[in-house]
Structure formats: structure tokens, C-alpha cells
From Swiss-Prot:
This is Large ribosomal subunit protein uL13. It holds the Pfam family Ribosomal_L13. InterPro entries: Ribosomal_uL13, Ribosomal_uL13_bac-type, Ribosomal_uL13_CS, Ribosomal_uL13_sf. Keywords: Ribonucleoprotein, Ribosomal protein. Signal peptide: none annotated. It comes from Yersinia pestis. SUPFAM superfamilies: Ribosomal protein L13. The keyword Secreted does not apply. One of its GO terms (cellular component) is cytosolic large ribosomal subunit. GO terms for biological process: negative regulation of translation; translation. The lineage of its organism: Bacteria, Pseudomonadati, Pseudomonadota, Gammaproteobacteria, Enterobacterales. Part of the 50S ribosomal subunit.
Length: 142
């Protein structure tokens, strides 16, 4: 019996919608990364993008445990000398709540072209509205 290898053109990708309100950030991001990679499918192949599309709603209502709301710090660099910037979890949620989930999930995906293709299938929205109704997403309870 030969080993099965999924072909990119034959992979069936479904659309799912997830409500992030009240969910713990790390536990939610772990499951999202797993589904974006396609590890929940029987035809999972490491070098082929077999994952599904995922829409995340209510990103501003995601929860963190302990004192991370005030203690967790996100860093980025502008590229200029002395251009390191930082923001706490609270500031990120106030300014751009979608980025919190995007950063958490992106760090759990593979680095390189395949990981970037998986990351593009993640759609995160701060509120309850999204513009993917035409794809008829199924509700995914995590």
C-alpha cells in the first residue's frame, strides 16, 4: 500500500466561523492554528496546505488569564534607529483587537511560504459583523 499524499488542487476547504468572546487567547489560537494547518483532517500532509478557512468574531472580547491584561507586552520595530515600540495587551485590545489573535496564531504556524499561505486563510474581526456570508461558513464551537 502506498502512502497517501494530498494534492493541493484536490483539497476540500470549508469555511468556519468562531466566536472568540470569553475564550482564552492561547487555547483559542492553538485550535485555530491546528485547523488552519489541516491537522484535524485524515488527509493531512505536512508539505501541503490542507487547512480550512476560519473567520473569528468578537476579537475584542478574548480573555487572558492572570495579570497578562496589564503585564503582557507586544514589541515591534519601525526599522529606524531606536525605533522599538511596545504596547500592553490592554492597549492592543483598545487600538487593534484583531492583531492580538493574528499575532498569537501566526506564531504557531510554520515559518516560510507554506505558513504564510495558511495564515492568509485566517480572517479576524473585532465585532460580530463579517463580509463572508457568501461562503456560508459553519459555526465552529471551540
Amino acid at each position: 500500500m502506498k502512502t497517501f499524499t494530498a494534492k493541493p488542487e484536490t483539497v476540500k476547504r470549508d469555511w468556519y466561523v468562531v466566536d472568540a468572546s470569553g475564550k482564552t487567547l492561547g487555547r483559542l489560537a492553538t485550535e485555530l492554528a491546528r485547523r488552519l494547518r489541516g491537522k484535524h483532517k485524515a488527509e493531512y500532509t505536512p508539505h501541503v496546505d490542507t487547512g480550512d478557512y476560519i473567520i473569528v468574531l468578537n476579537a475584542e472580547k478574548v480573555a487572558v488569564t492572570g495579570n497578562k491584561r496589564t503585564d503582557k507586552i507586544y514589541y515591534h520595530h519601525t526599522g529606524f534607529v531606536g525605533g522599538i515600540k511596545q504596547a500592553t495587551f490592554e492597549e492592543m485590545i483598545a487600538r487593534r483587537p484583531e492583531r492580538v489573535i493574528e499575532i498569537a496564531v501566526k506564531g504557531m504556524l510554520p515559518k516560510g511560504p507554506l505558513g504564510r499561505a495558511m495564515y492568509r486563510k485566517l480572517k479576524v474581526y473585532a465585532g460580530t459583523e463579517h463580509n463572508h456570508a457568501a461562503q456560508q461558513p459553519q459555526v465552529l464551537d471551540i
